[in-house]
């Protein structure tokens, strides 16, 4: 012992004591037991084998794209929670293996993740995972250095893995990896954890020979070593030795001593040591005390844990650390101790009453389920969580976890317990279990679940029987028999309905009629089995039986329970029946249907005129007009049919409608519908005077609510508040319960506010509240624009009163954005004291500070120090001193007060706030404030925790916008001076600036897609002397990089004739260049040459994908399929573009089988390359259409929209291709399907997509007719706005937006559409059209936004025309960002 300590003193000579001493923490889970057998350590084999001649940056760039997000997620998880999941680690590991080029950092991160960061896994499993990762990475060519060996050592210690330290050193030496100080420290820890002081002495000897310092960490491990050797006296004496060596024992030392006492169960010495630490003004963190708890639990002294828990200070981060401790304890079987720690969360959450504490037990319960803890134990913990107020519904959450983990027995036991506690147990709770049994056709498991639920009084419903139970058995009868045989209580009503559905789907109409006509059959609405019955009707030719069933449905009240009565119910059934049949089926069964309709007439079955019209349209589209007269006889005689009900009505003009009104009036017939059409036509033409005249002329006829709504909005658009108010009051007198849509109410508020009629505006707002008008996402934004328009007019009274009403009535939350006009109105007047007082009022009343930055900038510019000090005091009080300092900093920077700004940034204790810094940097970029941004970057150099790469990235973004390569070059120099390691995005941005300005890039650029790093290396070394071979290769690479594929190929052929070979990277570069130019045959020749010269040469992912794209372009689809198959067999990943191009080409050939082959290939990797879920669906449809099988295409897509878990987005692609390929017959049937989905299922996306495609290809009349048949298209605002936005991105598309607005004159987002239309005119340089649009908006009283005005002003100025308004001063980007924030209603409260 004395020799050991003497060696330590010798090494701790002056000059070495001050060196940094990374500690070896004895964290929960750190290793204790070692042996002298190498075991699995054989994986750390000598680093030998083939190493590629040079890295291929194209593959590395793709690698970064494909799984760097996951690595970032892993790193984020560690930083946030201190742990990761096995699933995440395995996913990242799989991605690394698949890519095949692991970097050093990635390997290090994966290895480090296999220790205590996986508290939910057993230690042995964690070690096995580390071994697998090590072996696989080594196999893939990863080069391990000392950091990797040290990481593996740390994992061994944390996982208590037994290994021989001397063997470990030997393996490192064999691999030519020199151990460093950290290696020796961890090897000493390995010996000390075993109590092997002699072994530790050997390692200390190594350190002495290498003149390495003995740090505090070494002494800490010696404390553990002596304690585990049974020598507590020497363990305590280590502290004296440390002091004599000039090292004061730190927290880690005391933790080591406390852990030693804990392993002995010596609670008295633990308490005494803790008191000594406090007396000496030392401090142990909660995480330190958790290590003591871990040791007490493992040593078998749980009775002392509470004493340690009571000493917790609940530091920031306590809960995540305690969670990890709990998980580790539970994994090792100490769940009761873990629960004791968990109960401390109540005290830790005391100061955070945000509801999070009610879910702190989630992780605990989930881990209990994963560890297969018995139900009674889980229940015990649930009760404890409830008592401690750590979970609002612990038993329900435990059930959710057990269902998610497919733990059937535990789930059923928990349901039983829930029932005993009086909690509801619903039938759908068992669906996850039944689904798994359904897949396995496991009748026994299904019966077990049903029986268990039956025993606790839970009866299954029809959905459960139909979807998850009956399909497990051979037939319904056997299902009923087996369930009854096992004593399962079956709800006869639901089971009978399930049986009815089953018989109907089977086509057994006789049994269906028998069941429905049975007096014992339960009362059930037709809607529950309509679909199944339609299927049966289509399969059967028994007209008599179908008529009997229809009559039964009509006359038996059990089946028509809706308030609308049997006319509607049976009518919709008939409509759906015809709708479900293809044209060919309707034509083939024309006579059959005629007989059916006749029998319905004889049975006195009646349908409504509205439903008749729908059936008529279906029959007409199926080309069986003769059947229409057989249906019309079913119409209720009390309803009036016009001539337009028999033939399709043509588009009517105003004069025609007026004539029809006069005719109907003369015949004393109602003409309300025609009058509505006439008014609507005048509204669409913006003819307010004529619309009001028509309304006045026929005032005796009751106008529909929709007519009043259209007139009101027309008057609002024409800034006529008097007529708008009169119409609104008249509507209220006629029908006080009438409710307008949201846009009409907003139009009224806007026009009243604009004209100073505040009381009227407030009355409208009150009505919105009283009538519970639905508030859309855009409503708050509309309120903001109304208030902001008043603020810009300087109308403070209007702003204040309307804002107060909006907030008081609860129509919108008082966000910073909504409150900003309250301040803006004073800023517009230049009244800073009033703006400040309003700001303070908003802060106190609404907890937000709107336009704070603008107010502070005005105060700084004016030099009003008193008001500025008052503002700072308020901000500091409300949001803290840190927020106040940042607000003041940005105000100084914005106004050019850089000396004052620097004083702020040098405030002691100021830390970086990335969100705030990003906000101001992006503001500088938007407003082109280069000087302010440069100063910000310079000032934040020494700001604590400031991400310097981020700051320089912002600066370079502005340099790029200004094409200022000199400032970018200066920034690059400063980056190097500060020793900042720039990220890839920063380097790419910097390289782009240099290249755009014709400057040489002074560094290797991380390449993207198929560009090769070798190319840049060749260019960088162009000045070096080279051999003829290297000169030839360099020439090929340079030409390839410049996309001069033909010249590169000629150079290659010249070298080939001279017998000169190239490197693998040069061949790859040339092949990619030729493929990108479509030189397929030449690329194949180069590929063959490369394979002959270089053994094992293959194309990488990007080049292989490019090969597929080229083969598709040349129509070599079989070759493309073979190439894709070869890629996947070689563990390569195709690009999204390659797969998409191939599938689309197969569809145009009608090759459905080929598409299905590709779909199967992509099943496991489709999500990783972000393949659209609609790619295969759309192209299968298209393949069916190309084959002439329209019905199959419709059968493929329709269930996807009508299913319960529909995730279908858009079939716009299919519509477009059908139009391009002139498939009019198919298009007509697709149109019928889209309209059917809209009318029957309220699924409007398909019909809206078709409408927009008609506009896109210029088929305006078709779009108009479709809109007339399906008016709901006009209400699909998000889809329509998206179409307008996309159109505005492409030059020459203004007409599309104009056509859309012409077709939908009442479009709710008209202001947005006008803004995009102005963008089109600006792109097309069409100043005349832009001016006309501006005048049109003024005539409609539509206020243009600032981005609109900015675009118009620039356009007019460039055209040499005068600008008739004050041009907004900021940049386009500034106003675009502002609009985005307004739209999302997410304006940052601090700004």
UniProtKB/Swiss-Prot annotation:
It comes from the Eukaryota. PROSITE patterns: PPR (PS51375). Signal peptide: none annotated. Residues 1-42 form a transit peptide. One of its GO terms (cellular component) is mitochondrion. The keyword DNA-binding applies. One of its GO terms (molecular function) is RNA binding. Keywords: DNA-binding, Mitochondrion, Nucleus, Repeat, RNA-binding, Transcription, Transcription regulation, Transit peptide, Transport. PPR repeats lie at residues 110-144, 145-179, 180-214, 215-249, 250-284, 389-425, 704-738, 741-775, 779-813, 815-850, 948-982, 1028-1062, 1063-1093, 1100-1134, 1310-1344. Residues 1118-1387 are annotated as: RNA-binding. InterPro entries: ARM-type_fold, LRP130, Pentatricopeptide_rpt, PROP1-like_PPR_dom, TPR-like_helical_dom_sf. This is Leucine-rich PPR motif-containing protein, mitochondrial. It comes from Xenopus tropicalis (Western clawed frog). The lineage of its organism: Eukaryota, Metazoa, Chordata, Craniata, Vertebrata.
């Amino acid at each position: 012992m004395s020799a050991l300590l003497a060696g330590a003193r010798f090494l701790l000579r002056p000059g070495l004591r001050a060196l940094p001493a990374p500690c070896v923490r004895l964290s929960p889970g750190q290793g204790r037991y070692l042996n002298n057998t190498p075991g699995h350590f054989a994986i750390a084999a000598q680093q030998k084998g083939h190493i590629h001649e040079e890295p291929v940056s194209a593959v590395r760039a793709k690698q970064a794209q494909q799984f760097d997000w996951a690595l970032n997620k892993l790193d984020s998880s560690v930083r946030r929670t201190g742990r990761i999941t096995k699933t995440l680690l395995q996913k990242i590991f799989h991605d690394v293996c698949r890519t095949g080029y692991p970097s050093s950092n990635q390997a290090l991160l994966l290895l480090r993740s296999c220790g205590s960061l996986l508290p939910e896994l057993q230690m042995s499993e964690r070690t096995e995972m580390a071994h697998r990762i090590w072996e696989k990475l080594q196999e893939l060519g990863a080069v391990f250095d000392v950091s990797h060996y040290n990481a593996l050592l740390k994992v061994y210690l944390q996982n208590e893995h037994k290994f021989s330290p001397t063997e470990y050193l030997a393996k490192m030496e064999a691999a030519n990896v020199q151990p460093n100080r950290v290696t020796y420290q961890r090897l000493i820890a390995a010996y000390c954890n075993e109590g092997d002081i002699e072994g530790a002495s050997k390692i200390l000897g190594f350190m002495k020979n290498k003149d390495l310092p003995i740090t505090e960490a070494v002494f800490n491990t010696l404390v553990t070593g002596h304690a585990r050797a049974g020598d507590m006296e020497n363990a305590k004496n280590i502290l004296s030795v440390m002091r004599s060596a000039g090292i004061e024992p730190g927290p880690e030392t005391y933790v080591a001593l406390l852990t030693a006492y804990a392993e002995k169960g010596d609670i008295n010495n633990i308490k005494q040591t803790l008191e000594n630490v406090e007396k000496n003004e030392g401090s142990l963190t909660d995480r330190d005390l958790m290590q003591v708890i871990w040791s007490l639990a493992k040593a078998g002294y749980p009775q002392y844990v509470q004493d340690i828990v009571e000493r917790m200070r609940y530091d920031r981060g306590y809960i995540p650390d305690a969670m990890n401790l709990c998980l580790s304890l539970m994994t090792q079987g100490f769940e009761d101790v873990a629960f004791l720690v968990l109960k401390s969360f109540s005290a830790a959450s005391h100061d955070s009453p945000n509801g999070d504490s009610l879910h702190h037990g989630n992780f605990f319960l989930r881990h209990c389920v994963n560890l297969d803890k018995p139900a009674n134990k889980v229940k015990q913990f649930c009760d404890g969580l409830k008592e401690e107020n750590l979970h609002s519904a612990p038993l329900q959450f435990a059930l959710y976890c057990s269902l998610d983990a497919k733990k059937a027995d535990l789930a059923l036991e928990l349901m039983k317990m829930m029932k005993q506690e009086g909690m509801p147990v619903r039938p759908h709770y068992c669906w996850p279990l039944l689904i798994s049994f359904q897949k396995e056709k496991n009748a026994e498991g299904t019966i077990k679940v049903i029986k268990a639920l039956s025993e606790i009084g839970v009866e299954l419903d029809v959905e459960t029987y139909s979807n998850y139970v009956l399909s497990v058995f051979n037939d319904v009868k056997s299902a009923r028999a087996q369930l009854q045989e096992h004593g399962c209580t079956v709800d006869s009503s639901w089971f009978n309905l399930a049986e009815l559905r089953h018989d109907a789907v089977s086509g057994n109409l006789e049994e269906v009629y028998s069941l429905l006509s049975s007096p014992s059959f339960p009362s059930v609405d037709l809607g529950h089995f309509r679909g199944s019955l339609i299927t049966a009707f289509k399969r059967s030719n028994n007209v008599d039986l179908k008529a009997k069933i229809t009559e039964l449905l009509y006359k038996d009240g059990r089946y028509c329970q809706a308030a609308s009565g049997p006319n509607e119910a049976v009518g919709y059934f008939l409509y759906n029946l015809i709708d479900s049949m293809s044209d060919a089926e309707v034509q083939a069964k024309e006579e059959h249907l005629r007989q059916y309709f006749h029998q319905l007439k004889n049975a006195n079955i009646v349908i409504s005129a509205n439903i008749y019209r729908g059936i008529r349209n279906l029959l007409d589209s199926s080309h069986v007009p003769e059947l229409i007269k057989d249906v019309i006889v079913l119409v209720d005689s009390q309803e009036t049919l016009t001539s337009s009900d028999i033939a399709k009505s043509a588009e009517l003009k105003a004069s025609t409608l007026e004539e029809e009104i006069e005719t109907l009036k003369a015949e004393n017939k109602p003409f309300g519908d025609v009058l509505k059409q006439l008014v609507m036509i005048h509204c669409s033409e913006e003819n307010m005077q004529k619309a009001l005249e028509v309304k006045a002329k026929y005032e005796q006829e009751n106008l529909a609510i929709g007519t009043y709504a259209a007139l009101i909005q027309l008057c609002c658009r024409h800034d006529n508040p008097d007529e708008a108010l009169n119409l609104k009051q008249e509507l209220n007198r006629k029908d006080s319960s009438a409710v307008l849509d949201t846009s009409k109410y907003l139009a009224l508020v806007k026009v009243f506010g604009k004209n100073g009629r505040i009381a009227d505006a407030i009355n409208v707002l009150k009505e919105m509240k009283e009538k519970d008008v639905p508030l859309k996402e855009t409503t708050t934004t509309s309120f903001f624009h109304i208030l902001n328009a008043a603020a810009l007019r300087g109308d403070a009274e209007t702003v204040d009163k309307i804002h107060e009403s909006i907030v008081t009535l609860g129509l919108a939350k008082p966000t910073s954005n909504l409150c900003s006009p309250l301040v803006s109105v004073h800023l517009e007047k230049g009244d800073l004291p009033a703006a400040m007082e309003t700001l303070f009022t908003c802060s106190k009343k609404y907890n937000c500070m709107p336009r704070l930055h603008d107010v502070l900038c005005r105060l700084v510019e004016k030099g009003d120090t008193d008001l500025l000090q008052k503002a700072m005091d308020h901000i500091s009080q409300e949001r803290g001193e840190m927020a106040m300092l940042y607000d003041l900093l940005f105000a100084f920077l914005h106004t050019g007060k850089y000396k004052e700004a620097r004083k702020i940034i040098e405030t002691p204790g100021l830390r970086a706030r990335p969100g705030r810094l990003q906000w101001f940097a992006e503001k500088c970029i938007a407003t082109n404030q280069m000087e302010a941004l440069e100063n910000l970057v310079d000032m934040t150099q020494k700001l604590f925790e400031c991400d310097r790469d981020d700051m320089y990235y912002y600066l370079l973004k502005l340099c790029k916008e200004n094409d200022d390569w000199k400032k970018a070059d200066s920034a690059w120099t400063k980056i190097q001076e500060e020793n900042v390691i720039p990220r890839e995005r920063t380097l790419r941005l910097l390289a782009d600036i240099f290249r755009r300005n014709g400057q040489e890039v002074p560094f290797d650029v991380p390449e993207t897609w198929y560009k090769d790093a070798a190319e840049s290396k060749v260019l960088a070394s162009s000045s070096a002397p080279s051999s003829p071979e290297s000169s030839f290769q360099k020439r090929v690479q340079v030409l390839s990089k410049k996309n001069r594929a033909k010249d590169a190929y000629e150079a290659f052929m010249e070298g080939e004739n001279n017998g000169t070979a190239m490197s693998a990277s040069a061949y790859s570069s040339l092949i990619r260049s030729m493929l990108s130019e479509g030189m397929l045959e030449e690329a194949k020749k180069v590929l063959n040459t490369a394979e002959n010269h270089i053994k094992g040469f293959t194309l990488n992912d990007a080049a292989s994908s490019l090969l597929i794209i080229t083969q598709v372009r040349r129509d070599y689809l079989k070759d493309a399929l073979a190439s894709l198959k070869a890629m996947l067999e070689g563990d390569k990943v195709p690009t999204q573009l390659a797969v998409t191009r191939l599938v689309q080409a197969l569809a145009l050939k009608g090759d459905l089988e080929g598409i299905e082959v590709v779909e199967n290939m992509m099943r496991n990797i489709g999500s990783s390359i972000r393949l659209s879920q609609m790619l295969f669906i759309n192209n299968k449809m298209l393949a069916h259409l190309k084959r002439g099988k329209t019905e199959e295409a419709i059968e493929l897509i329709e269930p996807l929209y009508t299913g319960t878990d529909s995730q279908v987005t858009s079939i716009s692609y299919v519509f477009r291709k059908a139009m391009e390929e002139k498939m009019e017959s198919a298009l007509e049937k697709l149109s019928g399907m889209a309209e059917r989905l809209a009318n029957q299922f309220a699924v409007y996306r398909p019909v809206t997509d078709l409408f927009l495609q008609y506009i896109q290809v210029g088929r305006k009349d078709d779009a108009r007719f479709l809109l007339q048949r399906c008016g709901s298209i006009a209400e699909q605002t998000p889809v329509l706005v998206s179409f307008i936005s996309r159109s505005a991105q492409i030059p020459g598309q203004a007409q599309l937006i104009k056509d859309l607005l012409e077709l939908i004159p009442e479009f709710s987002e008209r202001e947005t559409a006008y803004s995009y239309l102005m963008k089109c005119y600006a792109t097309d340089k069409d100043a005349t059209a832009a001016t006309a649009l501006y005048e049109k908006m003024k005539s409609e009283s539509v206020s243009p936004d600032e981005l609109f005005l900015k675009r118009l002003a620039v356009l007019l100025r460039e055209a040499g025309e005068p600008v008739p308004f004050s041009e907004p001063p900021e940049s386009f980007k500034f106003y675009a960002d502002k609009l985005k924030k307004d739209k999302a209603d997410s304006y940052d409260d601090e700004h």
